[in-house]
Amino acid sequence: GASQMGASVVLIERGQMGGECLNTGCVPSKALLTAAARGDSYSAAYEHVQRTIAEIAPQDSRQRFEGLGVRVIAASARFTGARTVSAGDFEIRARRYVVATGSTPVIPPLAGIDDVALLTNETLFTARPEPSHLLVLGGGPVGVEMTQAFRRLGARVSLVEELDLLP
């Protein structure tokens, strides 16, 4: 990367190293799909997801990035000027920034939603005990993948999408 070519690089992360992809996105979702396609039980699929995250985590660790010459700051960040970012007790000045903020699940304002055990992409992969019936809101790629995976794992799944499914 840039640090290996002599650039000064700072990585600011307020959450877990590896961000959304490693912890609550691509890695656990693909591990779950793989386990479900193999016909694993929910328990075995759960363990496969956790093991897969643990195997990849060292590649996204603070130690690895620091070993590559990247300064890692565990904090929230905000721009305080055109070329200045404040992160925790640090102030960083740079000519260029890459902003990769990740995402936050949106909980729709539905009547009764506060009365159910709600799962999001941030909690789905650690769901215990095994869900027997899921209602998936959203028929995009993630919603369809999770519908398929949990159905293969034996759960009843209902998928709801507000847009037309096919033209």
Model-identified regions with their sequence ranges:
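FAD-binding core/adjacent interface of flavoenzyme oxidoreductases
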Residues: 1, 5, 10, 17-27, ...
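Short amphipathic alpha-helical segments, especially helix-boundary/capping motifs
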Residues: 5-8, 38-41, 120-122, 152-158
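The feature marks cytosolic C-terminal regulatory regions of anion transporters and related permeases
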Residues: 13-14, 162
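Glycine-rich NAD(P) Rossmann-fold beta1-alpha1 loop
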Residues: 15, 140-141
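Glycine-rich active-site loop/strand segments that organize a redox cofactor
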Residues: 29-52
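Generic secondary-structure boundary signal with a strong preference for alpha-helix termini
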Residues: 30-31, 37, 81, 114, ...
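Rossmann-like dinucleotide-binding cores of NAD(P)H-dependent redox enzymes
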Residues: 51-58, 62, 125-126, 131-135, ...
